[in-house]
Amino acid sequence: MLVPKRVKHRREFRGKMRGYAKGGDTISFGEYGLQATTSHWITNRQIEAARIAMTRYMKRNGQVWIKIFPHKSYTAKAIGVRMGSGKGAPEGWVAPVKRGVVMFELGGVDEATAREALRLASHKLPVKTKFVKRGEA
C-alpha cells in the first residue's frame, strides 16, 4: 500500500477542495486514463483496490500508472471519546484529488480492455470519473 516514507508533520490541517486541478490533468504516460469529475479524498486502500481490479481484469497485460499519491494524513479520535483534549491520532493516508485530475493511466492494451478495466477501477473510488484518451484530456 502507498504511504509516505517520512513526513515533516504527523498531523495536517484538512484544507479546502475548491476549484479545478492546477496540474496532473493530462495523460502523460499511457494511452488511456481515468479522470476525476468531482473532488474528494482518496485513501491508500481505495487506490490499491482500484489497482488490483485493473490488473486482474487485464490479466497482467499492459501497464498501469498511478498518478496520485496519498501524502496527507488524516486523524480520528477513538469511539466514545468526548470532545476536546487535543486532536486525534493519525488514522491513515489520503490523496486529495480535485476534479480534472487523471488518477490512473493504462497502456499496452486495446481500447475496449482499457475502458472495462478503468470502469471496474472506478467502482472502487469515491469520485465520479470519466474515461479519457491521449490528446483529449
UniProtKB/Swiss-Prot annotation:
This is Large ribosomal subunit protein uL16. Binds 23S rRNA and is also seen to make contacts with the A and possibly P site tRNAs. It comes from Lactococcus lactis subsp. lactis (strain IL1403). The keyword Magnesium does not apply. The gene is rplP. It holds the Pfam family Ribosomal_L16. HAMAP family: Ribosomal_uL16. GO terms for cellular component: cytosolic large ribosomal subunit. Keywords: Ribonucleoprotein, Ribosomal protein, RNA-binding, rRNA-binding, tRNA-binding.
